[in-house]
């Protein structure tokens, strides 16, 4: 069937192989890996697992220091023997090559997004010839764009750009990214514009041009993904987020016969096994990293000794569930119910996190029917 419908495959033969492999892993996950109640909840629509084929293999989101990755040199140990090793970076040309390789390699080690920090300090050592640096940065972006993703929605690689630091380097990076965005129909590289210590107005003209031509930009006062997932402040280690599980609150509300107490009880009962399944997923992925399946992460985290992992469970359609299906008005009483649901979710996440010995984050996602 896949070969017959090969015209829908976006990345040629590799795309066909990836799709086939993910189909096999997805079936194995649902039939042999996940607890039966969690698998049944996914199949019934009570919860949703994104990227079933990659669930047990890759983390969803990575926050990592690109300066450390490149300055330490690219050494994949005994893995990927056909990939060049760069022991150290001393020139702008070596920096360009190393950056292109890092983008290509690290994008294969997450299913959704990698956020790279410290790009500006990395370039500050090579700021004598800014036009040449810009050309080399464009080369890095364009060369890395040939990397094949695991699906039609490839892993996004974003660079955090802090405003208020080394303005000349910031403008050089923005100019290079603008050129890359012009050349790429759907960019796989994005920018996180951190304006905590700077002013967006200083670079608003070029940023508006980038957005107009389809560049991927998000504004924040901290390190964040393109989807709004926040990294812990002042974290010195690599941070991994496992966040591709969502709970369908409107469906739970529909099955609760307009009883908000029963609704919250069902939410609690669903969250507990879901978080246990995510903890099991964390162990599986951590073991694969220790075995060197993800060589960049293995080297950077010293085989998971220097890393922080968070489980993220997303609640979808809270307002639609409370105001639309349970029948509460969007007033003071309705807001009390809303807060009760959030408190229930946070309480379960906190208790389960302590039990499992891992940080658990509760995220909120609006559904199309939310008011």
Regions found by a protein language model. Give the residues of each.
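Conserved phosphate/anionic-ligand binding catalytic regions in large, soluble enzymes, centered on
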Residues: 305-321
């Amino acid at each position: 069937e896949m070969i017959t419908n090969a015209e829908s495959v976006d990345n040629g033969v590799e795309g066909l192989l990836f799709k086939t492999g993910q189909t096999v892993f997805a079936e194995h996950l649902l039939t042999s890996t996940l607890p039966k109640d969690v698998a049944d909840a996914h199949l019934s629509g009570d919860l949703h697992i994104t990227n079933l084929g990659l669930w047990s293999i890759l983390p969803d989101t990575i926050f990592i220091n690109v300066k450390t990755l490149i300055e330490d040199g690219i050494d994949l140990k005994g893995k990927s023997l056909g990939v060049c090793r760069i022991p150290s970076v001393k020139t702008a040309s070596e920096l360009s090559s190393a950056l292109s390789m890092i983008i290509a390699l690290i994008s294969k080690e997450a299913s959704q997004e990698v956020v790279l920090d410290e790009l500006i300090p990395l370039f500050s050592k090579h700021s004598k010839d800014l036009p040449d640096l810009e050309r080399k940065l464009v080369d890095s972006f364009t060369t890395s764009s040939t990397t094949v993703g695991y699906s039609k929605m490839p892993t996004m690689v974003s660079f955090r750009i802090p405003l208020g630091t080394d303005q000349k380097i910031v403008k050089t990076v923005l100019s290079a990214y603008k050129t890359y965005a012009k050349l790429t129909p759907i960019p796989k590289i994005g920018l996180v514009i951190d304006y905590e210590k700077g002013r967006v107005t200083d670079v608003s003209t070029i940023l508006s041009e980038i957005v107009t031509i389809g560049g991927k930009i998000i504004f924040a006062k901290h390190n964040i993904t393109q989807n709004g997932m926040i990294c812990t402040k002042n974290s010195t280690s690599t941070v991994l987020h496992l966040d591709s599980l969502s709970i369908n609150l409107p469906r739970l509300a529909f099955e609760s016969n307009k009883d908000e107490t029963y609704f919250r009880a069902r939410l609690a009962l669903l969250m507990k096994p879901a978080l246990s399944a995510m903890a099991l997923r964390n162990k599986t992925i951590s073991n694969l990293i220790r075995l060197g399946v993800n060589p960049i992460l293995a080297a950077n985290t010293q085989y998971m000794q220097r890393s922080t992992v968070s489980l993220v469970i997303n609640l979808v359609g809270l307002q639609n569930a409370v105001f639309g299906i349970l029948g509460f008005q969007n007033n003071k009483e309705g807001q009390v119910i809303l807060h009760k649901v959030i408190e229930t979710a946070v309480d379960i996440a906190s208790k389960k996190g302590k039990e499992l010995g891992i940080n658990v984050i509760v995220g909120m996602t609006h559904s199309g029917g939310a008011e």
